[in-house]
Amino acid sequence: MNKIKITPSVPTHMEVEKIKENAIRLHVYPYESGYAISVAHPLRRLLLSSTAGYAPIGLKIEGVQHEFDSVRGMLEDVAAFIINLKNVRFKLRDSEQENVTLEYEFSGPKELFGKDFENDLVEVVTPDAFLATLNEDAELKMSIIVQKGIGYVPSEMIRDLLPQGYIPLDAFFTPVKKAVYEIEKVLVEDNPNYEKIVFDIETDGQVDPVSALKMAMNVMQSQMEIFTNDIEVTETVGQNIENSEIFYQPLDILDLSARSYNCLDKAGIKYVGELLLMSNEALKSIKNLGKKSLDEIQEKLSELNIDLGKLSDQEKETILKKIEQNKS
């Protein structure tokens, strides 16, 4: 029997299956028609943009001045080394730390891989990532700054955060490699109009997929929390511009001092309404209009119960039209 609902149904089932290492498939249902995508789409965006991870942000190599330099005994130039370094995914062993500076020394002949950069401070979750080939002449000394963050930050924004001598690196913080979803129909009490979210989440190993999901959900909840607070509705008090003929009168009616009047006149302000179209900042910027004149203008307007900068766009449009009519 059909019933008229007064509240939408909420999902009651969640199933999580492990697809492979650091990858899960999430099934959540049942959702009312149209609700599943309203949840899945922002969740995907948050997984990719707001899940915290780690990335190298600065590199210093002894004897190297910039990224277009080369290192004696290393087959790759510094630019190629940097590209390879971005593929190395670090994980700080102390989760409370936000950044660490790592010191390394390597000599050849040797091929460098991600696993060679693991130490007491960091774990490398991409141990097989290739970095460089050193020959017998190579003596490589370097420092790498690894930072915790979210999303993507270009090197231009990182440059000023680094100590002198470090090359800034583009930082890809997000540990989420894949976040895709499908919306499927699901039958609930013979009703085929309910929906199911099937969500695949894969990470690089810096965090596990379930932790990444929880981070994204926490971000979503925190963004929405403000709407659960007490909401105060304020009324916009208009200035009754339709019936206030004073708005369309010449400035003479304000009985301003000669200095104040002349400053406004030279600025092209002829009517009281034109004055009201200006903000306090715009008024202050008028040439030769000092603080004393500004105070006088505001005092004269206050006597008429008129406030600067309080008009809506519609009210401004009305004033402009009537002033143009008066001029013609």
UniProtKB/Swiss-Prot annotation:
Cited Gene3D superfamilies: 5' to 3' exonuclease, C-terminal subdomain, DNA-directed RNA polymerase, insert domain, RNA polymerase, RBP11-like subunit
GO cellular component, one term: DNA-directed RNA polymerase complex
Substrates-to-products reaction catalysed: RNA(n) + a ribonucleoside 5'-triphosphate = RNA(n+1) + diphosphate
Signal sequence range: none
SS bonds (residue pairs): none
Pfam family name, one: RNA_pol_L
GO biological process: DNA-templated transcription
EC number: 2.7.7.6
Region (Alpha N-terminal domain (alpha-NTD)): 1-230
Alpha C-terminal domain (alpha-CTD): annotated span: 243-328
Keyword Transferase: yes
Record flagged with keyword Transcription: yes
Classification via InterPro entries: DNA-dir_RNA_pol_insert, DNA-dir_RNA_pol_RpoA/D/Rpb3, DNA-dir_RpoA, RBP11-like, RNAP_asu_C, RNApol_insert_sf
One term of GO molecular function: DNA binding
Keyword annotations of the record: DNA-directed RNA polymerase, Nucleotidyltransferase, Transcription, Transferase
Family to which the UniProt record says this protein belongs: Belongs to the RNA polymerase alpha chain family.
HAMAP family hit by this protein: RNApol_bact_RpoA
Complex and partners: Homodimer. The RNAP catalytic core consists of 2 alpha, 1 beta, 1 beta' and 1 omega subunit. When a sigma factor is associated with the core the holoenzyme is formed, which can initiate transcription.
Purpose: DNA-dependent RNA polymerase catalyzes the transcription of DNA into RNA using the four ribonucleoside triphosphates as substrates.
Domain notes: The N-terminal domain is essential for RNAP assembly and basal transcription, whereas the C-terminal domain is involved in interaction with transcriptional regulators and with upstream promoter elements.
Name of this chain's protein: DNA-directed RNA polymerase subunit alpha
Organism of provenance: Nitratiruptor sp. (strain SB155-2)
Lineage: Bacteria, Pseudomonadati, Campylobacterota, Epsilonproteobacteria, Nautiliales
Encoding gene per record: rpoA
